[in-house]
């Protein structure tokens, strides 16, 4: 690894540490920097209210953003590589739509069928949503994996994934039509995405699952580098194309499914971060890109979480709105600078 690459990687890691601390300091309730430091280090006696805000609200939210951002960025890189498509992202195969459909069945039918609206169940309702999202997303992923063994071309698989997404959205539209207003509102709020839903035991489980999945995705680095060469060259070098595609899609799909289950559908991070890292590190080598997108995804998610909380104001902006507002200019600037460099050459 070149010295410049190492320096950039360390710079991103340092920015994560700074952003983590800023996420603990800034918010609707103003807590002095020194007080946050004392709370984190366990020294001094700070107000119990401040301790609860840091430990029970801001820290879980920051950790969730960090882990979710890293997972989505890795998933996006894998999808862009396997499909050789710069517009591919974690949601391209309809896995996020599958999660949304699973949640829609639970949320939109709970009141319509005479049951209790999930919005009234609090924590139990959140668990039900997570389970529904996992079932929905993994069901779609199982279908995609099955189809991937039946078709040869990546383009065909990509089109099928997009069609599955359209079908899922159509089913959601029908469910909305027959649902009561309260359930529709609860579903829309879930669909906006949030890093604040995960806390306590849920957060520990989420972090533990992602701590297993993310290192496993690094085992596919050599496979991803071979896939960059094209199917013909990769096959000549001994790569089983169908098996490799199955492993990469499964890895990306499970990462997306788990993040969506706990945080809702988070857009743009998985699409923007790989482009940003390719531009910064000037390489397509996944030995560099995989750790780069992991750290950059975590950092960008922390930035979005910080903006969404709007320090000094009550309430929070929808995370999806912030990720789009932050991610779109990033991609645009990268593409324009790349085009400018090509013209200069």
Task: For each feature predicted by the language model, list its residue ranges.
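Alpha-helical transmembrane segments in inner-membrane proteins
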Residues: 1-345
């Amino acid at each position: 690894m070149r010295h410049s690459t190492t320096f950039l990687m360390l710079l991103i890691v340092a920015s994560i540490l700074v952003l983590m601390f800023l996420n603990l300091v800034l918010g609707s309730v103003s807590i002095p920097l020194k007080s946050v430091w004392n709370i984190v280090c366990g020294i001094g006696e700070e107000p119990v209210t401040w301790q609860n805000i840091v430990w029970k609200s801001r820290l879980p939210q920051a950790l969730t953003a960090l882990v979710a951002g890293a997972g989505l960025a890795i998933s996006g890189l894998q999808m862009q590589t396997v499909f050789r498509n710069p517009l591919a992202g974690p949601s391209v195969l309809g896995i996020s739509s599958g999660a949304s459909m699973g949640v829609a069945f639970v949320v939109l039918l709970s009141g319509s069928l005479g049951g209790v609206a999930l919005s009234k169940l609090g924590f139990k309702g959140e668990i039900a949503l997570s389970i529904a999202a996992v079932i929905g997303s993994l069901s779609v992923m199982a279908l995609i994996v099955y189809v991937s063994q039946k078709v040869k071309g990546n383009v065909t698989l990509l089109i099928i994934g997009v069609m599955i997404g359209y079908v899922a959205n159509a089913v959601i539209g029908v469910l909305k039509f027959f649902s009561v207003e309260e359930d529709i509102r609860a579903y829309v709020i879930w669909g906006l995405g949030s890093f604040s839903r995960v806390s306590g035991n849920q957060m520990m489980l989420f972090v533990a699952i992602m701590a297993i999945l993310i290192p496993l995705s690094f085992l596919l680095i050599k496979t991803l580098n071979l896939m960059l060469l094209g199917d013909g060259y990769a096959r000549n070098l001994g790569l089983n194309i169908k098996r490799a595609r199955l492993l990469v899609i499964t890895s990306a799909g499970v990462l997306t499914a788990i993040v969506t289950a706990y945080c809702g559908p988070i857009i743009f991070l998985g699409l923007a971060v790989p482009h940003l890292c390719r531009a910064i590190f000037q390489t397509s080598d996944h030995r560099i890109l995989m750790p780069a997108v992991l750290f950059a995804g975590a950092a960008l998610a922390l930035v979005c979480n910080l903006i969404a909380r709007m320090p000094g104001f009550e309430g929070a902006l929808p995370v999806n709105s912030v990720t789009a507002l932050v991610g779109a200019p990033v991609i645009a600037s990268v593409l324009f600078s790349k085009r400018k460099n090509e013209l200069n050459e």
